[in-house]
């Protein structure tokens, strides 16, 4: 896999999960279309405009649709996931090959639900995850993982992109030759092992 492509992909992943970037609800509609196209039009998303900074969402039924309000896109996605789990009793897997099973009729929300996040930063991934199957993923796999992270409120996905460039700079500044440094680097499958020099 081209390192430049991986860098751009992980940069997109980080930006997608940042909680303070507001480009509006269309991204949520697109996610619904990917996950459950038959019901995608049944969800309304609305960004809250108040000055409260805590991540939160509100769920309610409105004119036969499910209305989700949140202070940012990440909160809106977490609200959607709360509805899917607790009302539709369904699960969104991070595996792109697994479909999301939805009820024929979306359940109504009897009274508004208001939920605040318990913490500001929600971390996901570790060095080892980049060495399992990720080196072989296609765009659909990454897209599903990005959707999954948004649905689960992740605000800080680990990104190891560029670490070898930093290692190269540090080690050559310390006097190692180009050949010595490059002989240490490995393929993407084993990059996570090289980070801590122990098997995962």
Task: Annotate the PLM regions.
Residues 190-200:
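Single conserved hydrophobic/aromatic residue that forms the stacking wall/gate
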């Amino acid at each position: 896999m081209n390192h430049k492509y991986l860098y751009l992909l992980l940069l997109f992943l980080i930006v997608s999960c940042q909680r303070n970037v507001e480009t509006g609800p269309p991204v949520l509609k697109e996610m619904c279309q990917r996950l459950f196209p038959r019901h995608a039009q049944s969800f309304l998303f609305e960004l809250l405009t108040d000055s409260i900074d805590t991540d939160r969402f509100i769920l309610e039924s409105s004119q036969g649709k499910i209305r989700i309000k949140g202070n940012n896109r990440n909160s809106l996605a977490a609200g959607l996931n709360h509805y899917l789990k607790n009302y539709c009793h369904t699960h969104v897997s991070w595996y792109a090959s697994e479909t999301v099973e939805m009820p024929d009729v979306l359940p109504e929300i009897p009274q508004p639900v208001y939920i605040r996040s318990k913490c500001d930063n929600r971390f996901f991934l570790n060095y080892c995850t980049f060495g399992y199957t990720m080196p072989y993923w296609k765009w659909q796999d990454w897209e599903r993982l990005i959707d999954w992270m948004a649905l689960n409120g992740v605000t800080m996905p680990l990104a190891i992109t560029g670490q070898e460039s930093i290692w190269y700079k540090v080690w050559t500044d310390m006097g190692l030759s180009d050949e010595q440094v490059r002989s240490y680097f490995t393929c993407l499958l084993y990059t996570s092992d090289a980070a801590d020099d122990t098997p995962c």
